[in-house]
């Protein structure tokens, strides 16, 4: 029997309405404010302090207790340090995914259940589970599945792809079946006008109002290297560090008339392979020929088809992935036949692309996409059909 629910209160409208809905359902609700970062902005005002003031105002209005927990050390060690380490190797990780995995659905989960004796946790994420928004369909002997939110424009399941089965079994997502404008209406009806009108936070919490590259440069020293043209193999300029650019991003090369884009980054040589988006017939045929590949699954040869104004090296209709994380378990269809029809996404809000997944080994998958995608990077998510 679920009675006590710990709600992550951020000071925003989504978590406020989450707490309001839970209280109206009759749960004993406790608000938990997570302090993950304490840097001050340009005015000397700590953004966390302002958010905490709003969180306290919300809980006073709803007549529920609010407890602040300090995860600054944990965030530094398990999110920020990991982020910096990966940037130094040339990989561009997603801090929201790291935070959800290691802090919100790990440390917060442990504190809520073990220190505050909560039966479940709840957040203002736009997501659903097979157990229902209030765990009303909870079954002890059944795995829970993460499901997309009703509001596809706000769906946040992409950022929740690394959370564990054990945590998800005790998670409530009351906003999973609501549209964003309805959530704001509920907030106003609940007397939370101040929060309903609050500007939505879209940035990374530790960056503030600064440009991300200016921020990251405080922690990673510049390390100049060469831009190498993929077609010619010649140097076309110098960069200040592979951490400053990601796959598919336009290169910062001064003096040239052509636009170059990052194809790949080599940490060992500190070079960035770049491609130009202006192709003539000769080098286009050469590049496309290099991008032929043998599909070992059905012994056919495929060629990537792309718009001639964009370099085909940036596009791919297949990938091989490893370090797979199944939230529930490996699908029975994949276990039995080695093939799974599903959907693919590698960036938040990108449309789902149909794909076929082939099992190579216990920890490796070959994914064939129905259409070529540009600049695929690490961190892909597959969704059931």
Which role does the model predict for each range below?
Residues 122-128, 133-385:
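AMP-forming adenylation/ATP pyrophosphatase catalytic core
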Residues 1-161, 188, 262:
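ATP-dependent adenylation/nucleotidyltransferase module used to activate substrates
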């Amino acid at each position: 029997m679920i009675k006590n629910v710990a709600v992550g209160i951020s000071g925003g409208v989504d978590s406020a309405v989450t707490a309001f809905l839970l209280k109206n359902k009759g749960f004993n609700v406790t608000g938990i404010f997570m302090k993950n970062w304490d840097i001050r902005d340009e005015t000397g005002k700590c953004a966390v302090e302002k958010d905490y003031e709003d969180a306290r105002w919300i809980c006073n209005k709803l007549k529920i207790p609010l407890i602040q927990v300090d995860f600054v050390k944990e965030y530094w060690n398990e999110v920020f340090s990991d982020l910096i380490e990966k940037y130094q190797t040339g990989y561009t990780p997603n801090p929201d995914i790291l935070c959800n995995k290691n802090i919100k659905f790990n440390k917060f989960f442990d504190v809520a259940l073990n220190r505050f004796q909560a039966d479940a946790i709840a957040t203002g994420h736009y997501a659903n589970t097979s157990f229902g928004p209030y765990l009303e369909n909870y079954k002890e002997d059944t795995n829970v599945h993460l499901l997309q939110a009703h509001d596809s424009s706000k769906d946040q399941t992409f950022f929740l792809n690394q959370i564990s089965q054990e945590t998800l079994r005790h998670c409530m997502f009351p906003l999973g079946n609501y549209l964003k404008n309805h959530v704001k209406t509920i907030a106003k009806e609940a007397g939370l006008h101040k929060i309903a009108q609050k500007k939505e936070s879209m940035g990374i919490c530790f960056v503030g109002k600064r440009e991300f590259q200016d921020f990251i440069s405080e922690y990673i020293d510049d390390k100049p290297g060469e831009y190498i043209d993929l077609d010619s193999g010649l140097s076309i300029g110098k960069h200040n560090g592979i951490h400053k650019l990601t796959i598919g991003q336009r290169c910062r090369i001064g003096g040239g008339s052509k636009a170059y884009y990052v194809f790949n980054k080599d940490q060992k040589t500190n070079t960035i392979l770049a491609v130009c988006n202006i192709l003539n017939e000769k080098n286009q045929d050469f590049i496309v020929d290099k991008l032929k590949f043998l599909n070992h699954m059905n012994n056919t040869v495929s060629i990537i088809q792309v718009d001639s104004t964009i370099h085909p090296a940036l596009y791919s209709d297949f990938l091989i992935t490893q370090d797979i994380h199944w939230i529930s378990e490996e699908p029975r269809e994949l276990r039995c036949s080695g093939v799974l029809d599903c959907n693919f996404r590698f960036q938040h809000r990108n449309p789902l692309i149909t794909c076929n997944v082939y099992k190579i080994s216990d920890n490796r998958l070959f994914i064939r996409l129905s259409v070529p995608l540009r600049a695929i990077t690490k961190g892909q998510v597959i969704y059931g059909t």
